Amino acid sequence: MYRALWLSPLRFIVSSSSSKLTPYVSRGRGLSGIDNGAGCSCSRSVTTMIGNEFIRCQDESKILQLQIVDALRSGERQGASALLFKLIQGNYSLSADDFHDILYYCARSPDPVFVMETYSVMCKKEISLDSRSLLFIVKSLCNGGHLDKASEFIHAVREDDRISPLLPIYNFFLGACARTRSVYHASKCLELMDQRRVGKNGITYVALLKLAVFQRNLSTVNDIWKHYVNHYNLDILSLRRFIWSFTRLGDLKSAYELLQHMVYLALRGEFFVKSNRGKLHSTRLYIPVPSKDETGSEKFAFGVTDRIVDCNSSSKVALPKGHNKILAIRVLRWSFNDVIHACGQSKNSELAEQLMLQLKVMQQQNLKPYDSTLATVAAYCSKALQVDLAEHLLDQISECSYSYPFNNLLAAYDSLDQPERAVRVLARMKELKLRPDMRTYELLFSLFGNVNAPYEEGNMLSQVDCCKRINAIEMDMMRNGFQHSPISRLNVLRALGAEGMVNEMIRHLQKAENLSAHSNMYLGTPTYNIVLHSLLEANETDMVINIFKRMKSCGCPADVATYNIMIDCCSLIHSYKSACALVSMMIRDGFSPKAVTFTALMKILLNDANFEEALNLLDQAALEEIHLDVLSYNTILRKAFEKGMIDVIEYIVEQMHREKVNPDPTTCHYVFSCYVEKGYHATAIEALNVLSLRMLNEEDKESLQDKKIELEENFVMSEDPEAETKIIELFRKSEEHLAAALLNLRWCAMLGGRIIWSEDQSPWARALSNKYG
């Protein structure tokens, strides 16, 4: 018995425009004629199978049905058609029951072609369809992808027929619409269900939820949830479906609330049975009766479960044979997996902490999630740099056969430069007897290869320690049967170069080159770039040139980074001609000069005090629409400061302002110091004031006037001895430019300068604009 529980249209799932289209249904002589595609438009009546006794098929018709099914299974379609013709030519009366086996097979196969052939034969013999026949036909057409034809069958049954299709037919059709994401057909079916007052049950809502998730329509899911709790008992299976929907649509708060309620039901010991086809069903007797005293949403909000019956009560139904009893813990784990996966993807750290508390509650009740779930979520947390949460999750794992979650955590520690915490990860892997893979060793070389860098330069002690670490990792790697990969080799070379171990780095490079020669492969360009850069940092210009020649001779192509390194090398040997030749090679290889290229060329010219050509390069970059950064301008400012060339300083400052390049503290230092050394102290203070304001981003500049009084009282003009400490705190909040600007303004005030909060108030800024603008 199905009650019409929700008669208001559910057409919020689709646009209202889709309801204007209807599939074509032809009407014949009978009560419900359907165009079967073969010119068969016949009369028939649909009879119910509920409350009626079935007449047994004659033995001969039963045998013919089985023979037809066997022929279809073996692919003998012509033989099956011949047997079907023989079936209808018998001297006995036939009913829809004599075709059930055939139609059932066509529904399971699916075989929509033969099901229509069978239906055509039934039309010719004027055999009335019953509800089972109609269900099998609709299933066959839906499973075969013919939703249009299945929709015609459902719509063709008129109100004056002896019965309408039962709710399972509508539910199956809606499920097929959800699987194929056919919103139009689902809309037409829902309209028909409302017109015929068929009602809905839990299976209907499952299909509607899938359609709503497909459309990314969270409001629809909320509406379905409200209607569901008003008319149905909440059990673990229904909660799982809604949790799945909310997590897919990103409503983690609602999903978490339902998960808590689900844990409550699981702790009460609700059981399920699993059918032979893998379907889960509750063991409780289920009769949907709407509550009259309060809405289901209100009951859920207060945590009242007045209609939930204990598993040990008399309402439990007997379990049929052939079913396996399954604890609700499995369903709970699935839902917990959904929520925690979504939490990891959304990087919601607050909810993640709540989930960890929920996890502890579940563990106390032996409801621990799957190890695979914990591992996957730990990997997500590591990518989001939530290393504390990731490490906590990995500590909960009792068994793991793959190393990727641990590798992700090692990579996070590498990004955060926290190698000391990586030691605990390795210890945990050893506890789990988890064998490292190549990615693990690549990360170990990156984490533990260098000792002092980037904080200090390498010394003899750190270099010895670096060699010991690298050798230990290599020995363990070989014990586990791994050879160096391109990434691990690159990390080793980078570590040796950072420690200044040039000879050891060259030895590793030669070893890698020999191995590559035996395998008829060349080392990758990034590997050579690491070596070239490290040699350049060590001022080993001759070795840089030799490595570059070896690289070209072995056929390894150079990239933009390679050419820029070599142009930088030319600045050390003071050869502008060689740098120009490299630029020519770079262009021939298809690479366009970038900002770093122009900076390197200007550095060579400035080393020879050729400011005019350096400024010409600056203008050329502007003509070619190459946006130079603050490092490029600081390169010129540094040389101008060393030479005491105020005119060049002022020109570069105005050029930066015109190109909208914000200065940094280094820029302020060069400009301020140059004016001070020339004795222009008042101008130096004013310039420092203006450049400090220009360091701020647009958002800070817009709010500067509103916060001017507060900043003056608390930071700039404050006599509090802790004022500078408070300013430094801004660095920890990643507001380094604001902190540097406030420190500069405070020093300007201490030097007796008048603080201005707008560039327009500065005579110095206006003078530069008039002179060079």
From Swiss-Prot:
This is Pentatricopeptide repeat-containing protein At1g76280. It comes from the Eukaryota. Pfam families: PPR_2, PPR_3. PPR repeats lie at residues 130-165, 166-200, 201-231, 235-269, 332-369, 370-400, 402-436, 524-558, 559-593, 594-628, 629-663. The keyword Repeat applies. The keyword Hydrolase does not apply. PROSITE patterns: PPR. InterPro entries: Pentatricopeptide_rpt, TPR-like_helical_dom_sf. Belongs to the PPR family. P subfamily. Keywords: Repeat. NCBIfam families: PPR.
